[in-house]
Amino acid sequence: MKHYIIPFFLTFQGCPHRCIYCDQKAIAGEPAEEVASVMETFLKYHGSEDYTAEVAFFGGTFSLLPQKRQQELLESVIPYIGKKQVQGIRFSTRPDALDEKMLVWYRNRHVTHIELGVQTFQKKYLDLLRRGYPPQTARSAVSLVKESGIGVGIQLMLGFPGQDRGAFFKDIQEILTLHPDDCRLYPLSVISGTPLEKEYQNGEMNFISLETAVEWVADAVEVIEKEGIGIRRIGLPHSPELEEKIIAGLYHPSFADKVRFELLRRSFDKAGVGQGQTLVVHPADLQYTYRIARMKKKQIHVVPDSSLRRSTILIQQ
């Protein structure tokens, strides 16, 4: 059964201040006011399918919007939940913008998942990003959401100026320890018009290479998925508008593709795939498996199996 996320964007809405890296105008899509029209379009094309779906409010800081505004947005979705056309609501917010009372209120209004814009659990990088809270606030927020019965995701950055592999994997270990339902991994990019651009122009910032980022993230995804934690997204969403505004840091429109390819390449080599063998892989990994087989000049057969974990290759006997 296919699962859809129907996203709406609250550009900067509710944010107590602007983080150093952020330009949501370059990243955002449908405004939240278009809930009804977007839902009707979605149902027109997918209503006859066997599917599950969630409406998502991203961008901004949902839980710091005026409560009346939050209620309007949530209630705009509830009729579709009542008709079983949508199964729940998710939103993104800051770790320092939630408490137990709010979580009870959200749970009673069909919120099924909250993504926390943690970015990092390390003080020096939180200070660099001007997030305005200490690492323990992020840890506590993840635990608080989990205890409420609402699903929780963590958004994590990498590629800070001067960051090494050890520092990045301190953050990955935090994810493994806290064990959210899923996470997003995306590299820090310098976007034109952000406060980070000013700092970049005023001094030297050293960023890791694309090849290094792919290696780090492939290693991270491997251990995260082994622990049963989902990967919601790798890299920033691709858009021509965003590409035009990135002036430094890490960005590639096919970053996730490069990571997934690297993971399958490792599995292919480890499995010792021979000529004419039949491989069993997750359906999402079919394209990578065929690409690697062509690259290695191997004639193979591939069988998809959705019960397999991503990046796994089994040889059918």
Label the predicted regions.
Residues I27-S37, Y45, G59-L188, S192-V214:
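Conserved non-cysteine loop/helix-boundary elements of the Radical SAM core domain that shape
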Residues K2, N202-Q317:
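Auxiliary Fe-S-binding modules of radical SAM enzymes
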Residues A53-V55:
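Non-transmembrane, interaction-prone alpha-helical and coil segments associated with secretion
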Residues K2-E34:
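Canonical Radical SAM [4Fe-4S] cluster-binding loop centered on the CxxxCxxC motif
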Residues C15-C19, I191-E199, L242-E244:
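Short acidic/His/Gly/Ser-rich catalytic and metal-binding motifs that mark active-site loops
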Residues V38-S48, A218, E222:
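A short, N-terminal amphipathic alpha-helix
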